Amino acid sequence: MSRFMIRAVFFRRYTAATVGKPFRNVAEVKQYLAKQTWSIDEILHGEDTGKAAKQGVPTEEEVRKLLALCAFPVEDADLQNSKRILVKQLSFINKLHETSVDDQDKNLDENYARLLPRQNKALTYDDLLKKIDGIKQDEATGEPTGSWDSTGLAKMRKDNYFIVRQGLLKNRK
């Protein structure tokens, strides 16, 4: 029995996971716990949802156009659910835009702050084409294979702008 307990203690000792730097004293723990944090519920269900609703909930026609633009099925779509999801996404984006992180960036150690680099190289048109070629459409999200070619209508390039002269103007008044 005691041999089993020793194995259990030994096993637990070497399987512990750590995240970030360890705390060195109680003051660091108190300082860490005193920092203001966000709750996802506050962000998505707080006052910002009301702001997004005041800014304008997308109409059913706008939701249909967005679904068609994304090549999702429009006929069998749950428009009310899509509207609710759009309002949540808009409120989350608004919250991110309102948050100032400039003061915090000075003290951040990038090794513990982000998984992606902060400064990224600008993409060129050729880089975008390579990335697009590698994208696989997901049938689970309703994307039919080969439904939309994002660069197929761009026939001309001038001053880093891509000119589309056909296809998109069919249903305009």
Curated annotation (Swiss-Prot):
Catalytic activity of the protein: L-glutamyl-tRNA(Gln) + L-glutamine + ATP + H2O = L-glutaminyl-tRNA(Gln) + L-glutamate + ADP + phosphate + H(+)
Classification via InterPro entries: GatF
One Pfam family in the UniProt entry: GatF
Compartments, record wording: Mitochondrion inner membrane
Transit sequence range: 1-15
Keywords annotated in UniProt: ATP-binding, Ligase, Membrane, Mitochondrion, Mitochondrion inner membrane, Nucleotide-binding, Protein biosynthesis, Transit peptide
Gene Ontology terms for molecular function: ATP binding; glutaminyl-tRNA synthase (glutamine-hydrolyzing) activity
Gene Ontology biological process terms, A to Z: glutaminyl-tRNAGln biosynthesis via transamidation; mitochondrial translation
Membrane-related topology note: Peripheral membrane protein
Any one cellular-component term (Gene Ontology): glutamyl-tRNA(Gln) amidotransferase complex
Main location class: mitochondrion
EC number: 6.3.5.-
Presence of the UniProt keyword Protein biosynthesis in the record: yes
Functional summary from the UniProt entry: Allows the formation of correctly charged Gln-tRNA(Gln) through the transamidation of misacylated Glu-tRNA(Gln) in the mitochondria. The reaction takes place in the presence of glutamine and ATP through an activated gamma-phospho-Glu-tRNA(Gln). Required for proper protein synthesis within the mitochondrion.
HAMAP family found in the cross-reference section: GatF
Protein family per UniProt: Belongs to the GatF family.
Oligomeric form and interacting partners: Subunit of the heterotrimeric GatFAB amidotransferase (AdT) complex, composed of A, B and F subunits.
Name of this chain's protein: Glutamyl-tRNA(Gln) amidotransferase subunit F, mitochondrial
Species, as recorded: Candida glabrata (strain ATCC 2001 / BCRC 20586 / JCM 3761 / NBRC 0622 / NRRL Y-65 / CBS 138) (Yeast)
Gene name per UniProt: GTF1
